A protein has these predicted regions:
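Flexible assembly/topogenesis modules
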Residues: 1-319
Length: 319
């Protein structure tokens, strides 16, 4: 199926886990992020100022992009978890070293969500501007690959590895629902840049906002390609001045998708012949934690919320 993400709708990806070995252990979702060139919006009037977009991905990008993970066998759902749940689980249960490793794997690093303060910079965003060099403009945020661990019961402990060898007539399926792209990054509101420039504070710029893809100035194609050079590369744009960047057809290439190459990676384990026979002939029982997530809206001030629980409850989390 498609390996790209939708701009305005949830994206669903279904993975059938093949029986390449006897046990399934660590499982990851791999997502490739594109290079990001965050351009600058030139002044349209004499009293206006230059307005940078200052594109950045949201914090905890790898887990926040996951809306839901559903694990099932033979049509029966075994576990459902969300990216928010995994984030809370990491914050609560992981030690500092494991937490730092998890953040690097899932893109929760300054190079992705705070480029103005990464690579030795201090509040200096690396805005992309068209260049006459052979290599072109340097990306504001370099593309990289995220490896997002699926924190299901079988991936947290090797003793709980999923027994694929016991699946004689059924298959293990993992279904991932990812949030739309417009919920995964923020930009400056370049249309609300002030004109009150003072030496002590510089030019006032707009607040960070979620992009509105109904606005031509917020289209994703403006960030996944270098800014066109109207001087040295006339084939890249129909215009001759950077001030025309506000025009809807300033960018000739207006494709919003990129090669996200979304796929699953898993760690398998092999058993001896005696162990395979034991798994295949004897019933295997596992204690699986079911995750229930409830959203409470309009909680203002001191209020009581109703917690509906049943059976044995190991813990609650609020966030």
């Amino acid at each position: 199926g498609s390996r790209s993400m939708r701009m305005l709708e949830d994206s669903e990806f279904k993975f059938k886990i093949p029986r390449y070995a006897d046990l399934l252990m660590d499982t990851y979702i791999c997502v490739t992020l594109p290079h990001i060139w965050s351009p600058i919006y030139p002044p349209q009037e004499r009293e206006h100022v230059w307005a940078p977009y200052e594109f950045k991905w949201v914090e905890n990008l790898g887990v926040e992009m996951i809306k839901e993970i559903e694990i099932s066998v033979g049509g029966q759902i075994l576990q459902k978890i969300s990216g928010s749940y995994m984030k809370c689980l990491v914050e609560r249960d992981f030690n500092t070293d494991k937490k730092n490793l998890f953040n690097k794997m899932t893109g929760n690093i300054p190079e992705i969500n705070d480029p103005a303060n990464s690579g030795g910079r201090v509040n200096m965003y690396p805005t992309a501007y068209f260049s006459e060099s052979q290599n072109g403009a340097e990306p504001s945020i370099k593309g990289q690959r995220l490896y997002i661990p699926i924190l299901a019961w079988f991936s947290m402990n090797s003793k709980m590895a999923f027994p694929l060898v016991s699946l004689q007539y059924n298959e293990l399926h993992v279904e991932i629902t990812l949030r739309p792209v417009n919920e995964l990054f923020v930009i400056r509101d370049i249309e609300k840049v002030g004109t009150d420039i003072r030496p002590t504070r510089g030019a006032p710029i707009g607040n960070y906002i979620q992009p509105n893809f109904n606005n031509q100035l917020h289209q994703f194609y403006r960030f996944i390609q270098p800014p066109p050079n109207p001087t040295t590369d006339p084939n890249s744009t129909l215009y001759t001045s950077l001030r025309d960047i506000i025009q809807p057809d300033y960018y000739i290439q207006q494709r919003n998708n990129w090669a996200a190459d979304i796929h699953a990676i898993a760690t398998y384990a092999f058993l001896s012949d005696e162990e395979v026979k034991a798994f295949a002939l004897q019933p295997q029982n596992y204690l699986i934690k079911e995750v229930y997530q409830t959203e409470y809206k309009n909680v203002v001030g001191t209020q009581k919320v109703k917690l509906e629980t049943g059976g044995m409850v190991s813990n609650w989390m609020w966030y």
